[in-house]
């Protein structure tokens, strides 16, 4: 067989490596039987030597596979731990009247909401960034706001003797704080610090929907859930345990305008008031937007006409070069 291969190589390559015509070479190769002529090129030998994986490579691939599987399991475990917050109820989206593009706040509801804050919320929560003058023209007249401010005593001074004194509140005074400092607030609320309500609606995900759901979402803890003393179950609060007792209930107060003081009505009014406190420029911003749209309706056709009849002439103008003769 080796002799046959040598003779065939000699026939194909010829003397001194000279090749024969392609047709003759192909004919000789095709006439040879596979069993009689086991030719192996260098490329085939190289591929056959790499077809099998060594023991070290197999061990490395196995280790990488186990590492990938472990990483996937760890990622799933961490994802499950992070998704534990899904146990908290997400507040639904309520149809607030001021959510339209051109809708304003209900100022009657703002007035009732301020009454709720004054009689229910102000005993624990402060509003450091809202003054009595901000109520003028929104839900109270100037005289009414002055009367409200005069009901509180504000520390002022020093006087001529260098001493601080108390005086009736004025329009430029801000709402009084229920506690002198945060330490006193924590001491009076079992270690919990009541948040400031000036920007509470803008500071919470969900806005007024979250505040409304929190105020009306108190319920008994489910079976198997135990709370320590001083905490209340609320599914909308992170952790479901809140230190604030249910602040509102039906007929907790009487509105000045005679509106029935149901729990949902009280929560709706105080949320509207807190929405205004978080964004006092709400109505002004929408009025400016409406004025801008009206101005744009007049300016856009004018600009389009100028572009078509003035700029298009300049844009389509061509310059021709005429060399001097």
Swiss-Prot record:
The keyword Mitochondrion applies. One of its GO terms (biological process) is mitochondrial electron transport, ubiquinol to cytochrome c. Its cofactor is heme c. It is an enzyme of class 7 (translocase). Residues 316-325 are mitochondrial matrix. Binds 1 heme c group covalently per subunit. It is found in: Mitochondrion inner membrane. Residues 1-84 form a transit peptide. It catalyses: a quinol + 2 Fe(III)-[cytochrome c](out) = a quinone + 2 Fe(II)-[cytochrome c](out) + 2 H(+)(out). The modification Phosphoserine is found at residue 182. Residues 108-209 form the Cytochrome c domain. The keyword Membrane applies. It comes from the Eukaryota. It holds the Pfam family Cytochrom_C1. It is a single-pass membrane protein. Its EC number is 7.1.1.8. The chain crosses the membrane at residues 282-315. Residues 85-281 are mitochondrial intermembrane. Keywords: Disease variant, Electron transport, Heme, Iron, Membrane, Metal-binding, Mitochondrion, Mitochondrion inner membrane, Phosphoprotein, Primary mitochondrial disease, Respiratory chain, Transit peptide, Translocase, Transmembrane, Transmembrane helix, Transport. Component of the ubiquinol-cytochrome c oxidoreductase (cytochrome b-c1 complex, complex III, CIII), a multisubunit enzyme composed of 11 subunits. The complex is composed of 3 respiratory subunits cytochrome b, cytochrome c1 and Rieske protein UQCRFS1, 2 core protein subunits UQCRC1/QCR1 and UQCRC2/QCR2, and 6 low-molecular weight protein subunits UQCRH/QCR6, UQCRB/QCR7, UQCRQ/QCR8, UQCR10/QCR9, UQCR11/QCR10 and subunit 9, the cleavage product of Rieske protein UQCRFS1. Belongs to the cytochrome c family. It is linked to Mitochondrial complex III deficiency, nuclear type 6: An autosomal recessive disorder caused by mitochondrial dysfunction. It is characterized by onset in early childhood of episodic acute lactic acidosis, ketoacidosis, and insulin-responsive hyperglycemia, usually associated with infection. Laboratory studies show decreased activity of mitochondrial complex III. Psychomotor development is normal. Component of the ubiquinol-cytochrome c oxidoreductase, a multisubunit transmembrane complex that is part of the mitochondrial electron transport chain which drives oxidative phosphorylation. This is Cytochrome c1, heme protein, mitochondrial. It comes from Homo sapiens (Human). The gene is CYC1.
């Amino acid at each position: 067989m080796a002799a046959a291969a040598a003779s065939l190589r000699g026939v194909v390559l010829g003397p001194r490596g000279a090749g024969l015509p392609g047709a003759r070479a192909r004919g000789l190769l095709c006439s040879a039987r596979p069993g009689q002529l086991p030719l192996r090129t260098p490329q085939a030998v190289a591929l056959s030597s790499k077809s099998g994986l060594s023991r070290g490579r197999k061990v490395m691939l196995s280790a990488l596979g186990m590492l990938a599987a472990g990483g996937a399991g760890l990622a799933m475990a961490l994802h499950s731990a992070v998704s534990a917050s899904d146990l908290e109820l997400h507040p639904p989206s309520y149809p607030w009247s001021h959510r339209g593009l051109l809708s304003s706040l209900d100022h009657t509801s703002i007035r009732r909401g301020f009454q709720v804050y004054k009689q229910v919320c102000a005993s624990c929560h402060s509003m450091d960034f809202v003054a009595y003058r901000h109520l003028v023209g929104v839900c109270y007249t100037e005289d009414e706001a002055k009367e409200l401010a005069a009901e509180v005593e504000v520390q002022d001074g020093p006087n001529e003797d260098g001493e601080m004194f108390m005086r009736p509140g004025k329009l430029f005074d801000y709402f009084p704080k229920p506690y002198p400092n945060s330490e006193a607030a924590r001491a009076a609320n079992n270690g919990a610090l009541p948040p400031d309500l000036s920007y509470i609606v803008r500071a919470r995900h969900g806005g007024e929907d979250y505040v409304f759901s929190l105020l009306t979402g108190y319920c008994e803890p489910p079976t198997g859930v135990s709370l320590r003393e001083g905490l209340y179950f609320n599914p909308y609060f992170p952790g479901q345990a809140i230190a604030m007792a249910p602040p509102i209930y039906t007929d907790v107060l009487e509105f000045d305008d005679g509106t029935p003081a149901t729990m949902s009505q009280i929560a709706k009014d105080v949320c509207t008031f807190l929405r205004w406190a978080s964004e006092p420029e709400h109505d002004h911003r929408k009025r400016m937007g409406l004025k801008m749209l009206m101005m744009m309706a007049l300016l856009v056709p004018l600009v389009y006409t100028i572009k078509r009849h003035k700029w298009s002439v300049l844009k389509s103008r061509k310059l021709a070069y005429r060399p001097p003769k």
